[in-house]
């Protein structure tokens, strides 16, 4: 590193501390990331004459080394701040790091509830209206994989009991018909007997004790309550049941297109987040399905 480059680095450190008033931890990280980047530059290129193509090459090298998106973002922040500093100082006319971006951080997969825990959750007992209503709601979420907004918007006419179907108005006002399982139909029927005794303002399928359409927040709160009462190890909410529906369907059928239609996803890529099945399940499917994978029976 040239003496001139070291001088500017010292000035940059002072600028970060004094003018930008960044924490000592952040300044230390930025200086480390600049040093890391400079060591990967081609011979004859330093932090003062680096070009965009050089930073792109360094970014690729760091990515190949296995740096996480979070670490790459920190490195990019450092070289962008360095470029802005040199720009302000009149050393360069364009920031070579401007516009560079790190690979997107992978979104953590939502955790589904296993089948046994779902069964335990849905085994709530009681014949009072609220319990019957809540059981019908949870059965329908798990049976058909509805979104919270879709379920809350259901009317009495939305469910076709003879056909075991529900007509749903999804995102973008797109209508779809989704199958409803026997347990959900039975739970809804039990709830409707109680609903008849409530003076309702509209035709909402799920209503409060005062006859008003049940709000999103109320549905979320009731499901959280039942998760706690049934002593589940994780928090229960509508999307958790939707995710569990999708995961369990794919584990049983592996029909991605069918699950896409059931969930109302416009793009298949959205449905694919549910395909991260555990290896034990995949290995079992492979052993059962592949003609040359079946293990010999013990003799």
Swiss-Prot record:
Per UniProt, residues of the Tyr recombinase domain are 108-287
Gene Ontology MF annotations: DNA binding; tyrosine-based site-specific recombinase activity
What HAMAP family does this protein map onto? Recomb_XerC_XerD
Q: Which organism is it from?
A: Shewanella sp. (strain MR-7)
A GO cellular-component term linked to this record: cytoplasm
What positions does the domain Core-binding (CB) occupy? 3-87
Protein name as catalogued: Tyrosine recombinase XerC
Q: According to its UniProt entry, what is the function of this protein?
A: Site-specific tyrosine recombinase, which acts by catalyzing the cutting and rejoining of the recombining DNA molecules. The XerC-XerD complex is essential to convert dimers of the bacterial chromosome into monomers to permit their segregation at cell division. It also contributes to the segregational stability of plasmids.
Q: Would you identify the family this protein belongs to, as annotated?
A: Belongs to the 'phage' integrase family. XerC subfamily.
Please verify whether the record's keywords include Cell cycle.
yes
Assembly and oligomerization: Forms a cyclic heterotetrameric complex composed of two molecules of XerC and two molecules of XerD.
Q: Name one GO biological process term.
A: DNA transposition
Query: What is the annotated localization of this protein?
Result: Cytoplasm
Where is it chiefly localized? cytoplasm
């Amino acid at each position: 590193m040239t003496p001139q480059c070291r001088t500017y680095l010292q000035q940059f450190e002072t600028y970060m501390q004094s003018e930008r008033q960044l924490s000592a931890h952040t300044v230390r990280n930025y200086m480390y990331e600049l040093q890391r980047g400079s060591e990967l530059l081609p011979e004859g290129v330093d932090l003062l004459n680096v070009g965009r193509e050089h930073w792109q090459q360094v970014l690729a090298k760091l990515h190949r080394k296995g740096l996480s998106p979070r670490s790459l973002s920190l490195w990019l922040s450092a070289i962008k701040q360095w470029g802005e500093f040199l720009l302000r100082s009149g050393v360069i006319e364009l920031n070579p790091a401007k516009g560079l971006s790190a690979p997107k951080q992978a979104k953590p997969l939502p955790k589904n509830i296993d089948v046994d825990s779902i069964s335990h959750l849905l085994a709530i007992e009681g014949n009072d209206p609220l319990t019957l209503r809540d059981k019908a709601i949870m059965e329908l979420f798990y049976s058909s994989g509805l979104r919270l907004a879709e379920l809350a918007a259901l009317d009495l006419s939305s469910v076709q009991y003879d056909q075991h179907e529900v007509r749903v108005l999804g995102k973008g006002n797109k209508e779809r018909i989704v199958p409803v399982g026997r347990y959900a139909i039975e739970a809804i029927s039990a709830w409707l007997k109680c609903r008849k005794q409530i003076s309702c303002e509209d035709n909402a399928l799920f209503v409060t004790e005062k006859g008003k359409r049940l709000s999103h927040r109320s549905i979320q709160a009731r499901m959280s309550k039942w998760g706690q009462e049934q002593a589940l190890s994780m928090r229960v909410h509508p999307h958790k049941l939707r995710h569990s529906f999708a995961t369990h369907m794919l584990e049983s059928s592996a029909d991605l297109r069918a699950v896409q239609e059931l969930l109302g996803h416009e793009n298949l890529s959205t449905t694919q987040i549910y395909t991260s099945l555990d290896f034990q399940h995949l290995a079992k499917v492979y052993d059962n399905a592949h003609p040359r994978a079946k293990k010999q029976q013990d003799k």
